[in-house]
Amino acid sequence: IFTENGADEICIIVNRLHPQTEAHVRHLMAQPGHAPIRLAVETTPSSMHSFNVLAPWLEDAPFCLTTVDTIFREDDFAAYIRAFRQGQGGLMAVTDYIDDEKPLYVGTDADLRITGFHDSDEGDRYISGGIYALQPEAIATLRRCMAEGRSRMRNFQRALVEDGLELHAWPMSKVLDVDHASDIAKAEAFLSETPTPQP
């Protein structure tokens, strides 16, 4: 899906706990027909730390970041990437479908500019979809977070707002998080549904 949407390269981090995952990615790397893949193998204490491992590969151009447990429709993602290419700031995927153990609520204004990220519902319509399209200057915010001992991607997102980076929300029809084995069947059913046409 990243190749189909114009990725120059695909940067992946996997942990050392499941060697079969690394083996699978290395198998993909040997196959033709996709953007070049860079692989980091490192076990980290949080998602922000994993991002930090990838950061040296991302700091020279706009990039899209997501996690392995985020499930979304391919056509939603394609529209999201097209919108990001047309803008100047960061574009964060959001959804009004809430089926997450600990959702991160996203505050927005009337123009979908992001005003904050909240652990509880403060009257927000959307939650984070776990897909982040950002400009290279976001790496400076990441480095500040690491220097301050922060962890978790939700705290990185808050820091982007603190630093005054321009962020907009991009609503997707539905985004699922696969946190447990029981979520796999739910994700498969979601992906097999016929998409509802967007207005």
Task: Give short role names for the model-derived ranges.
Residues R73-A147:
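Conserved core of the sugar-phosphate nucleotidyltransferase
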